[in-house]
Amino acid sequence: VKSREEYLRLRNSGNQIANVSEARNGNIEAKRDLVQMNYSCLPASGGLLRGATRQSNSVGMDLDFDPTRPDYDQLMAELPAKVIGMKDELGLLMLERSATKGFHIVFRRRTEMSQVENLEWASRLIGVEFDKGAKDITRVFYTTTASADDLLFLDDELFTGGEPTDESPSAVQ
């Protein structure tokens, strides 16, 4: 995906919108049919992730919360403003509500840190528990729609690979 337009088109297809709705109603098969994105690509043993030509300048991170927690609704309501409020420090490129129980964030990779160190750093900054199972660099994220309720923040730097241009519009919140 090389442009905002293509990204939004994939997220807003009729199938995607229907599958997000079904996934949120507990349909596991519908979740598996959602558009998948990989925001973290690093050289791995045996070469790069198939189809990748270089290391990504971003890191994707899951922020999942247990819906049975007594403070679940509060976390879901407050976290977006908190993350967007630290967008510069975090290097936020994308924030979306996940299909089920939390959020996905994408932020600028700190090249002096490993994948795990990047995830630990972001977890500390945001104030959430580090997901020890989230260190797999080939992890994909099931995307949601491009609605304002799902796609909460998107910076065009996500599509330029860290090389913003004068033509790049400002981030949309």
Indicate residue ranges for each PLM-predicted region.
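Functionally critical loop-and-helix segments that line ligand-binding/catalytic clefts
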Residues: 154-169
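Hydrophobic residues at beta-strand termini and immediately following loops
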Residues: 61, 95, 143
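Short, solvent-exposed coil/turn segments
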Residues: 54-56, 136, 163
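Flexible helix-coil linker/hinge segments at domain or subdomain boundaries
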Residues: 124-152
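A signal for specific C-terminal beta-sheet/loop modules enriched in small/flexible residues
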Residues: 14, 22, 26-27, 35, ...
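Short beta-strand
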Residues: 93-100, 131-136
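Modules that initiate DNA replication and primer synthesis
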Residues: 50, 54-90, 99-128, 147-149, ...
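DNA replication initiation on ssDNA origins
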Residues: 1-57, 169-173
